[in-house]
């Protein structure tokens, strides 16, 4: 079953956003090579410029967990933890399909 992952990052004012965006792009490229990766999209909020959102879809939860514990991915996560204004938001969702008409 497909798993959707939602990530929300809110950076402090002094964070280097260009560096952060570069790391997001690097992680997106690395994710594309991971087993079970289907797609992702990311960007800055149109409402709050210090907020970034990442949404991705994976074939299964095992693939998400493997990706989350990939060494380079963990290294980048830890690099930015001190630069969050708010707690990092991480949610997982399963897809919903309309039941057939009965």
Ranges and model annotations:
Residues 1-51, 59-69, 85-102:
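Short S/T/G/P-rich N-terminal loop/turn motif that feeds into the first structured element of a domain
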């Amino acid at each position: 079953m497909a798993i959707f992952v939602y990530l929300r990052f809110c950076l402090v004012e002094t964070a280097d956003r260009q560096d952060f965006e570069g790391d997001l792009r690097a992680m997106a490229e690395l994710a594309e090579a991971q087993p079970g990766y289907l797609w992702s999209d990311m960007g800055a909020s149109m409402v709050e410029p210090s907020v970034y959102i990442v949404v991705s879809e994976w074939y299964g939860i095992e693939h998400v967990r493997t990706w989350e514990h990939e060494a380079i991915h963990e290294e980048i996560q830890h690099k930015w933890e001190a630069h969050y204004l708010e707690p990092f938001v991480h949610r997982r969702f399963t897809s919903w399909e309309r039941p057939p008409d009965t």
